[in-house]
Amino acid sequence: MRFATRVGAYEIDSVHSQPQVAHCHAFFVPNDLRGQGLAHILKSHQKATLASLGYDFATCTVCGSNAAQQRVLTRAGWVRIASFTSSKTGEEVEIWGCEVAGACSTAYITMGIQHENLLDRRRKEALL
């Protein structure tokens, strides 16, 4: 299922044989909004959504050269589980995971709220 916000979008699907495991994909922030910390807000939104949907664990994949996404995942409490070379692209692909009810949810949601407050202040200042 696709979830869209003001700062980007992502998708969450249940793993077929393990319905308590979510696979997260298609996470993106539009190019014109990048570099403002909004991926952290979007990741926080994703965490809250995963928790509200009752998942126990989440996985995602990221290109091994995508340092920005790796930083977002690390800061959110995700851990790199494995990597492999894609037979389609020849690039390294990393598999990341996180316990939804564990460290990657509560602390990160709090951080996301702080980022949202900062974003709201910036928007108000821009309107003045």
Residue ranges and their predicted role:
Residues 1-25, 30, 122-127:
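Acetyl-CoA-dependent GNAT
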